[in-house]
Amino acid sequence: EMIQKQIQEMLDHQSIIRTSDVVKKGIPKPYLNRMVENGQLIKVARGIYITDWSQYDEYAIFQLQHQKVIYSYLSALYLHGLIDVIPKYKEVTVYTGYNPHRFPKEVKRHFIQKELYEVGVTKLQTSFGNEVRVYDLERSICDLIRERQKIDVEIFSTSLKRYIQSSKKDLRKLYKHAREFHVLENVQSLMEVLYE
């Protein structure tokens, strides 16, 4: 009873529970299995549990399974609210040399050299209130411009316009990232057009 109460308290604060969270609190693992059998918990992945399917946060759960991934490109734009439509697939960036074994087909991977992998990493809350690692607005805009040929025209222009209108934008940071990713000229010319 006492232990179930402890687990319940954890669930009051977080919608996703990991086996490691429970073990850290000194709770024996079999309690989780018991709660699954009683229908109090749902096991959604190895070592990851939720209380209810309505709490199934695919972005947070996927990142708990693959802790090196950072949401990027369309996924980042969506999480930042620059596009409204939920992307058909998740897009993530990992560093070159990382072996993304067991990645589902519906995840699009981008590789980047290790020294640029951490540039612009930030944390955001999903619509479920869980925290995920995602590239900041400025890095996302630079990525968009770098891959312009492969990005849907409407998504490209909507994202840029919304970025310009956003109170969260940081143009100094944008130019700093643009320099690091060698897209400074492209960024400057686009900004001139958008600010006219």
Predicted stretch roles:
Residues 8, 21-22:
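A generic secondary-structure micro-motif detector
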Residues 2-15:
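Short amphipathic alpha-helical interface segments
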Residues 24-37:
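Short amphipathic alpha-helical interaction segments
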Residues 17-21, 36, 44, 48-196:
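Nucleic-acid-binding surface
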Residues 11, 24-25, 65:
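Charged, low-complexity surface patches
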